């Protein structure tokens, strides 16, 4: 193992640790709240499932990183790599859709519009979110099924290519494989569009609300304005981190076609880990309950609480 491999594993390990700590913290706080009250709000449920999916995703990415360093042959071919790709694809799409559902929930709860369609969705927000979560599960299964079909076509192509019988049938299968491979990236489009729609609706709603506050000579730092800003920050950060993640995913996926194959894959893996690890802290800071518990925990760790006293996280 060379210096580059060592640095790569250290960076991946650090990102993995931060991601597990943050997402684990989210799961712990929401799980503790549910254990005490036997109830969980819709937003807490979505955040908890988002954290769980990201913990699994981080474990998959870390496993993939170890394969790049210690077992390149297994990483580039074989059933193990296909299994990792299948679990990565399913968990990845599920995580993205959970983040999208969270943005839609914030939009429906915080934004204010008089359009009948928006009001219909707002009044039935719980039912809408349940159907969105079910749709997210189905679309994640669909993207995984598309990947499995891609693997089957790839196996057929390898078999035909091995016989060195490049016929019209081979060309058709190859074109079909390339088409499915390109269309596979379109599974990312729906959550991206929905997130953008939620973001712009919140922006328009905040603009209207701010103008009303100015007309009424009211402070612009009222609770509604702050709620708008928090939701916008969470959705916007998800959008930019998602674009970074998608770019990294393409680099990691198409690394075989780049000059420095292994280095390209390493860069892609490091960038890929940044999204599930980094966005968890933005979610924590954007949620009042999680932020309060996190601050109390930091105070306790820093020794700001008196010895023997208990903060909210321990009560």
Swiss-Prot record:
Name of the protein in question: Taste receptor type 2 member 3
Lineage: Eukaryota, Metazoa, Chordata, Craniata, Vertebrata
Record's subcellular location: Membrane
Annotated source species: Papio hamadryas
Entry superkingdom: Eukaryota
Entry GO MF terms: bitter taste receptor activity; G protein-coupled receptor activity
Topological category with respect to the lipid bilayer: Multi-pass membrane protein
Pfam families given in the database record: TAS2R
Gene3D superfamilies assigned: Rhodopsin 7-helix transmembrane proteins
Family: Belongs to the G-protein coupled receptor T2R family.
Stored InterPro entries: GPCR_Rhodpsn_7TM, TAS2R
CDD domains: 7tm_TAS2R3 (cd15020)
Annotated glycosylation sites: 165
Gene: TAS2R3
Extracellular compartment segments: 1-5, 63-93, 149-185, 255-265
Function noted in UniProt: Gustducin-coupled receptor implicated in the perception of bitter compounds in the oral cavity and the gastrointestinal tract. Signals through PLCB2 and the calcium-regulated cation channel TRPM5.
Keyword ATP-binding: no
One GO term describing the cellular component: plasma membrane
Entry annotated with the keyword Membrane: yes
Membrane topology (Cytoplasmic): 27-41, 115-127, 207-233, 287-315
TM regions (residue ranges): 6-26, 42-62, 94-114, 128-148, 186-206, 234-254, 266-286
């Amino acid at each position: 193992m060379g210096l580059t491999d060592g640095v790569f594993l250290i960076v991946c390990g650090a990102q993995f640790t931060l991601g597990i700590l943050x997402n684990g913290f989210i799961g712990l706080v929401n799980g503790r709240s549910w254990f005490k009250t036997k109830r969980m709000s819709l937003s807490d449920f979505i955040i908890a499932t988002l954290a769980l999916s990201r913990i699994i995703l981080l474990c998959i990415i870390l496993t993939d990183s170890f394969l790049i360093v210690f077992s390149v042959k297994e990483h580039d071919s074989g059933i193990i790599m296909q299994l990792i790709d299948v679990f990565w694809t399913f968990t990845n799409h599920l995580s993205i859709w959970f983040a999208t559902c969270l943005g839609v929930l914030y939009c429906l709860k915080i934004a204010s519009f008089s359009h009948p369609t928006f009001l219909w969705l707002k009044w039935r927000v719980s039912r809408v979110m349940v159907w969105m979560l079910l749709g997210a599960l189905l679309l994640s299964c669909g993207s995984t099924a598309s990947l499995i079909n891609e693997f089957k076509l790839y196996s057929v192509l390898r078999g035909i290519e091995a016989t060195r019988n490049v016929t019209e049938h081979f060309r058709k299968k190859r074109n079909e494989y390339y088409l499915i491979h390109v269309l596979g990236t379109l599974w990312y489009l729906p959550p991206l569009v929905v997130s953008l729609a939620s973001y712009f609706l919140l922006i328009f709603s905040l603009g209207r609300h701010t103008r009303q506050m100015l007309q009424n000579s009211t402070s612009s730092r009222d609770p509604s304005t702050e709620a708008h800003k928090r939701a916008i920050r969470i959705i916007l950060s998800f959008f930019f981190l998602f674009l970074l993640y998608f770019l990294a995913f393409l680099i990691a996926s198409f690394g075989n076609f780049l000059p420095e194959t292994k280095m390209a894959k390493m860069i892609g893996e490091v960038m890929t880990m940044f999204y599930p690890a980094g966005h968890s802290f933005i979610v924590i800071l954007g949620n009042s309950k999680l932020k309060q518990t996190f601050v109390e925990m930091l105070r306790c760790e820093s020794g700001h609480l008196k010895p023997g006293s208990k903060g909210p996280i321990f009560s």
